[in-house]
Amino acid sequence: MAELSTRYNLPANVTENSINLDLNSTARWIKEPSVGGWTVKWGNFVFHIPNTGMTLLHHLKSNFVVPEWQQTRNLFSHLFKNPKSTIIEPFLALRILLGVALKDQELQQSLIPGFRSIVHMLSEWLLLEVTSAIHISPNLLGIYLTSDMFKILMAGVKNFFNKMFTLHVVNDHGKPSSIEIKLTGQQIIITRVNMGFLVEVRRIDIEPCCGETVLSESVVFGLVAEAVLREHSQMEKGQPLNLTQYMNSKIAI
């Protein structure tokens, strides 16, 4: 019987995403200096991070600010008026964002147990450490982090970026401007401001007297410029959006 055959079919087009797919890239954090900032490589992402906002954050944290900035200092008093707060560099703030993006997938999606374990390890590494690599057993990577799972993971990070771009800049219209997540021992708040995204991490302590959880005064925070994430986001492709998503002259950052 004559049978259908694909003997002489042309090779399928190879997309950019399938070239040099390195599953181990999720376990490496490569940071290199660049003109005016840094280049960070993680997963299949390459982020170009300018040293934007650092000087302004330090000015806001000082006592020598113009009157127009006082409202911003008052709104974020736990950051700018708190002697126990620490400003971190933009690439560390980005690292926290990526950790939260992975944690968001871990908490919200029905992942198979082995894959969930890898996502958990990666998110904890990004959130709690500053090392350039994490060792994950090659057997685990080979079994649970397949190329398809890798693509799902990266797509989930992009979806989280898209969610961030639905936020409005801090405003007085009651429109949502922050994403908050509570993890074991810490609370992370991501807030959209004029310059990008303000990332803050506050430790959660337990009161010895009553066992209740309270937010510690100790907090680290940093700023990720909007352009860093926009090139990896699928939002705002020409459609008009509410202007409160873009600018609020009442805040300094």
Swiss-Prot record:
Belongs to the filoviridae membrane-associated protein VP24 family. It is a peripheral membrane protein. Monomer or homotetramer (Potential). Interacts with nucleoprotein. It comes from the Viruses. May act as a minor matrix protein that plays a role in assembly of viral nucleocapsid and virion budding. Unlike Ebola VP24, mVP24 has no measurable impact of host dendritic cell function. Disulfide bonds: none annotated. The gene is VP24. This is Membrane-associated protein VP24. Its main location: virion. Keywords: Host cell membrane, Host membrane, Membrane, Viral matrix protein, Virion. The keyword Hydrolase does not apply. GO terms for molecular function: structural constituent of virion. One of its GO terms (biological process) is viral process. Transmembrane segments: none annotated. The lineage of its organism: Viruses, Riboviria, Orthornavirae, Negarnaviricota, Haploviricotina. GO terms for cellular component: host cell endomembrane system; host cell plasma membrane; membrane; viral nucleocapsid; virion membrane. It is found in: Virion membrane; Host cell membrane; Host endomembrane system.
